[in-house]
C-alpha cells in the first residue's frame, strides 16, 4: 500500500484499541515515534539540528 493510504488507515478508529499506532505527520514513518514531540526520530534529529525545536540541542560531554 502507498504511504498516504496507510496514513489514512492509521487515522481511522480501529476495531480494537490495541491496534492503534502513531505515525509521523511529516514523513509518515510508523516506527521510532517520539510521543513528547509528535514526530519520528529522524524528523526530530533534522529539526533539532536546524534549531527548529526550542530547548533542544545536541548533547556534548
Curated annotation (Swiss-Prot):
Keyword Ribonucleoprotein: yes
Binding site for Zn(2+): 24, 27, 40, 43
GO biological process, one term: translation
UniProt cross-references to InterPro entries, sorted A to Z: Ribosomal_uS14, Ribosomal_uS14_bact, Ribosomal_uS14_CS, Ribosomal_uS14_sf
Keywords annotated in UniProt: Metal-binding, Ribonucleoprotein, Ribosomal protein, RNA-binding, rRNA-binding, Zinc
Gene Ontology cellular-component terms listed: cytoplasm; small ribosomal subunit
GO molecular function: rRNA binding; structural constituent of ribosome; zinc ion binding
Domain of life, source organism: Bacteria
Cofactor-binding details, from the entry: Binds 1 zinc ion per subunit.
A Pfam family matched in the record: Ribosomal_S14
Record bears the keyword Zinc: yes
Required co-factors: Zn(2+)
Assigned protein family: Belongs to the universal ribosomal protein uS14 family. Zinc-binding uS14 subfamily.
Subunit structure: Part of the 30S ribosomal subunit. Contacts proteins S3 and S10.
Biological role stated in the UniProt entry: Binds 16S rRNA, required for the assembly of 30S particles and may also be responsible for determining the conformation of the 16S rRNA at the A site.
Protein name as catalogued: Small ribosomal subunit protein uS14
Organism: Desulfovibrio desulfuricans (strain ATCC 27774 / DSM 6949 / MB)
Amino acid at each position: 500500500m502507498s504511504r498516504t493510504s496507510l496514513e489514512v488507515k492509521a487515522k481511522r478508529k480501529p476495531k480494537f484499541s490495541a491496534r492503534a499506532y502513531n505515525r509521523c505527520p511529516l514523513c509518515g514513518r510508523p516506527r521510532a515515534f517520539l510521543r513528547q514531540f509528535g514526530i519520528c526520530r529522524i524528523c526530530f534529529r533534522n529539526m533539532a539540528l536546524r534549531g527548529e525545536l526550542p530547548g533542544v540541542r545536541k548533547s556534548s560531554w
